[in-house]
């Protein structure tokens, strides 16, 4: 069974973490390569305009696989250098692949998002939570540190003070608190989660694919660039956008008072 599955619904892709018997825990050998391959395939498909990331079963992701951490022969054994290598070629490959998706990503958080699972949700651009979802970064309770980039992601999502509170206490928060803290955009009844995510993805997917990808790139660059650098990148992306048929279609649709039909040209 592959750790991730992809379902294509026209311009929308649903990426499902697929280890429900272990609450979609990650860290087995090969997980990084499987997620990277799935994300590379989506990036190469210009017909995909939006991705929904969710979990199979009752959890989004419980994070790292505790049973494998306890296994003396497992991937987290062998001392410092082998463990460092495992993180870089496996856990970090998962993180880099999801963070590097070119199109907008919606995390549909259907249950527990703990540790790495919470950080995976933060890699999405938009997060919608089921009212059954819960969030936490419990690394310290295992004698660990956030090893997947969470110390970079979470403060940028909810601010340094809230992130520090979650990291230093190991507390879990419910979906309502996550919404109050800005970790998720909205909370919806559990049974409507995927319908809500698909509705939002449909809105996004109706927009020009090139402009969507360029805008996501600008948002990502804006997290680390100066304002002058952001302006320079924006002018380049805008020059590309002005040359597209989709730009002309958007202008004409507005002048003609009709809905635009963007074809990715």
Task: Report the location of each language-model feature.
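Crotonase-fold acyl-CoA enzyme core
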Residues: 41, 96-210, 243-244, 249-252, ...
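Non-membrane alpha-helical structural segments and their capping/turn regions in soluble enzymes
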Residues: 29-36, 85-88, 92, 191-194, ...
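Glycine- (often His-adjacent) and acidic-residue-rich active-site loop
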Residues: 22, 55-97, 113, 143, ...
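Phosphate-coordinating loops and pocket residues in cytosolic domains that bind phosphorylated ligands
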Residues: 25-28, 62, 71, 141, ...
């Amino acid at each position: 069974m592959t750790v991730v599955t992809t379902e294509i619904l026209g311009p929308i892709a649903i990426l499902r973490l697929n280890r429900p018997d272990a609450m979609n825990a990650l860290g087995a050998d090969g997980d990084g390569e499987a997620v990277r391959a799935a994300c590379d395939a989506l990036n190469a498909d210009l017909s995909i305009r939006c991705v929904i990331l969710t979990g199979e079963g009752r959890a989004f992701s419980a994070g790292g696989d505790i049973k494998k951490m306890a296994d003396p022969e497992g991937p987290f054994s062998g001392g410092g250098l082998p463990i460092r290598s495992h993180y870089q070629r496996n856990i970090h490959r998962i993180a880099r692949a999801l963070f590097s998706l070119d199109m907008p990503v919606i995390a549909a958080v259907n249950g527990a998002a703990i540790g790495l699972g919470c950080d995976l949700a933060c890699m999405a651009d938009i997060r919608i939570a089921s009212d059954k979802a819960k969030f936490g970064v419990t690394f310290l309770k295992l004698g660990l540190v956030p090893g997947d980039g969470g110390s970079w992601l979470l403060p940028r999502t909810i601010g340094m003070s809230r992130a520090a509170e979650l990291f230093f206490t190991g507390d879990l928060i419910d979906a309502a608190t996550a919404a109050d803290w800005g970790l998720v955009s909205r909370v919806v009844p559990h049974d409507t989660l995927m319908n809500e995510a698909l509705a939002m993805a449909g809105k996004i997917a109706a927009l020009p694919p090139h402009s969507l990808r360029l805008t996501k790139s600008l948002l990502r660059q804006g997290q680390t660039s100066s304002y002058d650098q952001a302006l320079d990148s924006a002018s380049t992306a805008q020059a590309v956008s002005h040359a597209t048929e989709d730009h002309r279609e958007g202008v004409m649709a507005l002048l003609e008072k009709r809905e635009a039909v963007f074809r990715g040209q």
